[in-house]
């Protein structure tokens, strides 16, 4: 293993912009941008968030060096949530990335496992919990759709351990073939999305790319139940970067956009951050090219028109959701030190609303602007509006700042949505103001009461664990999706919620947060205000299936399963390349209630190798088509049309 694989920020080929070199609140934009607006006082929040970290502090599971100025590197401690023992209940795993070179030398990263005790309303250590020896963990989530959580780590050669029974398989590499992986440094982030619209979740991997030749953004397409294939040909990358996070979503103009959320060690003035999808290639795979959807007059540029690029301000995380319920994704990007906010538009570019939002930066006790890292949109107070939560902390450059520029301890900022895409700082009212250096966010519903609880990971100290005890008379629900024809986590689905029939609907997006170092299974929180039930819920699945449910009770979690409209047999989608073997395609058109639509018209088409053995035939469960394998290796893409409208997923078949 190369010594540079786990080199930290101080090893960069070029210095990152310091807070003074980055855009500052007092030199951004015309003066009228920073005129404060009248913000209604926040509601009484009751206890706010309750800190549950004491058991971890008493347990002291790790030896953590004390924080000090001019640190060469820092310990990262990340809270992760998932079922590590196969009992159907989630555990909390604290993953420790030490400052020493033990990880570089191939030693496994330490961890500690806890469980939330609902009776005691506190976390307790899980005695005897054992995980495979792996590098620092990035996530505990179901990667292959078999219902069992898997492990994914921040190092390519031992990245994946598949959940099996009450344990895990031996760690395996992401993909053994890419030649440029050895020239890339450590993995910094993962993002899950169906990049090629085949109904399977793929991996977008961000790596520390400060030593060319290397690639900063890796697209790994799923090619089987537990296999991924890197496709470097899908992205045209003109300038490599050091992304702290990777992101993917389909925005209102209809294009899927990938983000390499970072700056370039080579030239931060020219590094692209955004890539949009274009026409697919002859084999049906997507292609992505760099572009800039930011408006020329963006907050982060100050008075300069169209320059610098957003990469100059060191992007570190991103989140997207529909803040104004207009059916378009809005986007926030963590910059140094700006909380950059864009409103989604029908056509590029975005609209910059950073100043109007009211919280372009937040100051530490030193008076200097803090550095934002992870961020998320979530309805913390269940008032039906999406709030904004942002973790702030040092990067390596900030640790070595001279005393007159040192930011000092920072904190997690909580910003209440007061309407009109405006936000008010309610950090102290929610009791989230503990000082430290924070980088990662983990949202979870520890107690299954329908609101978002919080874990914050940082540097040189244990994560902070918080239970949402906001008491303002409002109610909410947590919604988790399980896709069948769509990807199994429902990433990319849109939810429309009617609290009352005929009322104004709320819109929520599934899978809109990208963090450094950690990846989580997505879920959605919906605040209902004073209502105790959802009158109607509409799920627009990535497959194109539209499902409706009614009368969902508040103050609990619900799991919504997609009625399957397309089933491939065998589920591996692989068959021998012998000219005889067949794959079966079952199409079941659904009405919004999930029932079979017997009056539908179904057509199945095939592109690539293999042969479609006649039109789809009607049966009791729907329409069935047979695809006969080609006599030689190859692939084919299935397109299904229902009443002339193509499903949005196109499964790929493999002949081996």
Q: What kind of region is each of these model predictions?
A:
Residues 7-44, 59:
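Ser/Thr-rich, Pro/Gly/Ala-heavy low-complexity intrinsically disordered linkers and tails
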């Amino acid at each position: 293993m190369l010594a540079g694989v786990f080199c930290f920020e101080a090893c960069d080929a070029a210095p990152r912009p310091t807070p003074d070199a980055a855009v500052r609140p007092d030199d951004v934009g015309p003066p009228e941008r920073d005129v404060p607006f009248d913000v209604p006082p926040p509601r009484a929040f009751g206890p706010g968030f309750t800190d549950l970290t004491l058991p971890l502090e008493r347990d002291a599971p790790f030896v953590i060096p004390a924080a000090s100025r001019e640190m060469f590197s820092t310990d990262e401690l990340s809270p992760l949530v998932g079922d590590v023992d196969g009992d159907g209940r989630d555990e909390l795993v604290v993953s420790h990335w030490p400052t020493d070179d033990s990880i570089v030398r191939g030693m496994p990263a330490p961890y500690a496992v806890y469980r939330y005790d609902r009776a005691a309303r506190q976390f307790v250590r899980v005695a005897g919990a054992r995980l495979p020896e792996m590098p620092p963990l990035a996530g505990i989530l179901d990667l292959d759709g078999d219902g069992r959580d898997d492990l994914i780590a921040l190092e390519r050669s031992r990245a994946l351990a598949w959940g099996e029974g009450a344990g895990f398989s031996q760690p395996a590499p992401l993909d053994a073939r890419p030649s440029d992986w050895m020239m890339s440094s450590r993995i910094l982030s993962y993002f899950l999305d169906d990049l090629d619209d085949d109904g399977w979740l793929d991996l977008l991997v961000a790596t520390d790319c400060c030593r060319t030749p290397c690639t900063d953004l890796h697209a790994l397409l799923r090619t089987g139940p537990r296999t991924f294939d890197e496709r470097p040909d899908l992205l045209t990358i003109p300038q490599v970067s050091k992304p702290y996070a990777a992101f993917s979503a389909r925005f209102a103009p209809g294009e899927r956009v990938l983000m390499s959320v970072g700056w370039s060690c080579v030239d931060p003035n020219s590094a692209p951050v955004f890539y949009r999808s274009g026409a697919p290639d002859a084999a049906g795979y997507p292609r992505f090219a760099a572009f800039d959807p930011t408006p020329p007059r963006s907050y982060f540029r100050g008075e300069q028109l169209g320059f610098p690029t957003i990469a100059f301000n060191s992007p570190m995380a991103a989140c997207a959701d529909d803040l104004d319920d207009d059916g378009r994704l809005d986007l926030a990007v963590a910059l140094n030190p700006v909380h950059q906010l864009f409103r989604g538009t029908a056509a590029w570019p975005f609209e910059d609303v950073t100043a109007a939002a009211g919280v372009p930066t937040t100051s530490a006790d030193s008076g200097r602007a803090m550095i934002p890292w992870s961020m998320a949109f979530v309805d913390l107070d269940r008032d039906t509006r999406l709030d904004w939560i942002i973790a702030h902390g040092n990067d390596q450059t900030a640790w070595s700042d001279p005393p007159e520029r040192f930011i000092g301890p920072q904190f997690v900022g909580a910003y209440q949505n007061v309407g009109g895409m405006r936000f008010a700082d309610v950090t102290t009212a929610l009791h989230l103001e503990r000082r430290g250096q924070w980088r990662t966010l983990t949202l979870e519903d520890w107690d299954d009461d329908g609101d978002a609880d919080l874990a914050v990971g940082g540097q040189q100290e244990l994560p902070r664990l918080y239970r949402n005890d906001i008491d303002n008379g409002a109610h909410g629900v947590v919604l988790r999706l399980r896709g069948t024809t769509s990807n199994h986590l429902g990433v990319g689905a849109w939810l429309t919620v009617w609290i009352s029939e005929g009322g104004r609907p709320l819109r929520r997006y599934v899978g809109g947060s990208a963090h450094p170092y950690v990846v989580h299974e997505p879920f959605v929180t919906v605040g209902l205000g004073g209502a105790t039930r959802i009158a109607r819920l509409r799920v627009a699945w990535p497959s194109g299936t539209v499902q409706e449910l009614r009368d969902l009770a508040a103050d609990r979690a619900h799991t919504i399963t997609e009625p399957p409209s397309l089933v491939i047999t065998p589920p591996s989608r692989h068959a021998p390349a012998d000219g005889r073997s067949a794959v079966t395609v079952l199409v079941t058109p659904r009405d919004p209630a999930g029932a079979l639509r017997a009056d539908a018209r179904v057509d199945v088409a095939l592109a690539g190798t293999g042969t479609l053995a006649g039109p789809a035939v009607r049966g009791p469960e729907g329409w069935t088509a047979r695809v006969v394998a080609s006599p030689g290796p190859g692939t084919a893409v299935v397109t299904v049309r229902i009443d002339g409208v193509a499903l949005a997923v196109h499964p790929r078949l493999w002949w081996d």
